[in-house]
Amino acid sequence: MRTTKWLMTAILGLLMTGSAGSSTAPTPEARQALAPTGKLRVALQLANPLNVIQDSASGEMTGVGFDLGKELARRIGVPFEPVLYPSVGALLDSGKSGAWDVAFVGFSPARAKEWDFTALHLEVEFGYLVPGGSAISTMADVDRPEIRVAVQEKSGPDVFFTRTLKNAVFVRAPSNPGALEALKSGKADVMGSIKPVLFELSKQLPDSRVLDGRPGIDPHALAMPKGRDLGVAYAGQFIEDAKSEGLIKAVIERAGLRGVAVAPLK
């Protein structure tokens, strides 16, 4: 395991070094739009491997958003500053006051009214986590009046499952760990989220399992505050380059994610 992790880190480093010239250097105006404070402040949701996971022993951070944000900062020639949040709701609320410059989040038409987005960089499967011994064995068992579904409030999964589940009862928590706690304590029968989060959290709940199948896909993209058109244009080209160079595939593999695919080129 340690050898595999070292190898993926080495490959990622080579990709980043080898692709140094793939994106044209930004104009001063584009750099200012991306990093008006002189640093690229990248908003990241903790305990979400699509954003960032921190090793409790070493303190090392990994995750698709963390690695891509760090690389974008390197390419535009400014320091990388991760800005960490416990939930996507807190992340988005903080962005309204200008606390960050870019974020890697689920795309939706509602969010596009508040933020500018690049083309998609990830397609992420939704799924369900059930505890050991659960009578819920298939996705078809979930949408019933007696089934309580834990979700992180204001998240993409919250929006998706609220729209698609017609009979189940929702138990909303302020964060993914909070939704897991509802499942652990018996306040919920199943947790709905994106599969990378579910697989990560399942490590904390022995004998739990992620149900087979996928009820839907959560599209993810880079988001920026509105009004920074030159910055969004540069970030959009960075995302396309990262897809074509194999960089996004490499950061997915480094994070060991399941249920995630690189989005098609624009």
Predicted segments, located by residue:
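Extracytoplasmic small-molecule ligand-binding "clamshell" domains
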Residues: 25-106, 245, 254
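Bilobed "Venus flytrap"/periplasmic-binding protein-like clamshell domains
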Residues: 41-49, 58-75, 107, 127-180, ...
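Alpha-to-beta junction loops
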Residues: 41, 77-79, 96-105, 146-148, ...
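A ligand-binding cleft/hinge motif common to bilobed small-molecule-binding domains
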Residues: 89, 106-114, 160-161, 184-216
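Acidic, polar ligand-binding/catalytic clefts
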Residues: 66, 70, 74, 79-143, ...
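Ligand-binding clefts/hinges and TM-proximal coupling segments of bilobed small-molecule sensing domains
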Residues: 23-25, 30, 156-173, 210-211, ...
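Periplasmic-binding protein-like
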Residues: 46, 122-132, 195, 199-240, ...
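Extended ligand-binding regions for polar small-molecule ligands
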Residues: 25, 63-75, 133, 140, ...
